[in-house]
Amino acid sequence: MNLITLLVLGVSTCLIYGIEADEKTSSALENEIVEILNGNFKNEKKSIETSDQWLKGRFGREVNQWLKGRFGRELSDQWLKGRFGRELSDQWLKGRFGREVLDQWLKGRFGRDASNQWLKGRFGRELSDQWLKGRFGREGSNQWLKGRFGREASKNDLEKQNGRGDSDQWLKGRFGREARKQLLGGRFGRKDMNQLLAERHGRETSDQWLKGRFGRQLSDQWLKGRFGREVKNDKNNPFRSRYTGDSTQLQRENNQPIEELRDNTEKVSIENKPIMKKTSVKISKTV
């Protein structure tokens, strides 16, 4: 056998022994490797220094240091840096071969700090806020996790996820049950349609706008379910006709432009105000 064959045989044997590193002590494993190399090179009348030179050219460092770092103890940061292109601590080996991966390794692996809570969440427990922050670029709360994995989602999560108002029907289909009243109450409060849409879009909105926004003509039933009974019970609200079933008034408003609708709204509000008549009462004083 030539020198190259012996070297390949020696390195292959080292790799096989390296797999069993957890079961053998560092000193015993190192001695076995040295004996194998010394035996192979003695038969070829070569010194261990020759192998050092070859391995140095092959791996860029002294063979003894490489063998010690590769098989006799935890891999050094220098070897790992050359092997994986980054700095890895000895703690990485413990995590790699059956022990918990420490924060230092996770920082190098994922480019951020990762706590032990992340590991617990990654392999069967709830993910911590720190992990969610790194994973999704924002602070992930426990409420988000509950909503993500089958429980009610907070109003902040729904707003970030969908960027729009979520109706009862959508929430029912999304989470398999009726959304809590607290959720919708937090989103819409007790505001009527006119005020809510004005705050959200900065203007009064008509049925034409709603049609363009939602792709269909919103019915009284949908509006009633979406905003509750607050507007319906408000007699002074100009949009009350949409909830009371007055189709004539609704059609008249739909065919009018927004400016006329505003004018009519003002007229309606004025007409609904009670008119107080002045009455003079004469009181005769009798002596």
Swiss-Prot record:
The N-terminal processing sites of the Pol-RFamide peptides are acidic suggesting that cniderian nervous systems may use a variety of unconventional processing procedures. Pfam families: FARP. The modification Histidine amide is found at H201. Its main location: secreted. Residues 238-257 have a biased composition (Polar residues). GO terms for biological process: neuropeptide signaling pathway. It is found in: Secreted. One of its GO terms (cellular component) is extracellular region. Residues 229-267 are annotated as: Disordered. Residues 22-52, 62-64, 74-77, 87-90, 100-103, 113-116, 126-129, 139-142, 152-168, 178-181, 192-194, 204-207, 217-220, 230-287 form a propeptide. Residues 1-21 form the signal peptide. The modification Pyrrolidone carboxylic acid is found at Q53, Q65, Q78, Q91, Q104, Q117, Q130, Q143, Q169, Q182, Q195, Q208, Q221. Belongs to the FARP (FMRFamide related peptide) family. Has direct action on motoneurons, and effect includes transient inhibition followed by prolonged excitation. This is Pol-RFamide neuropeptides. It comes from Polyorchis penicillatus.
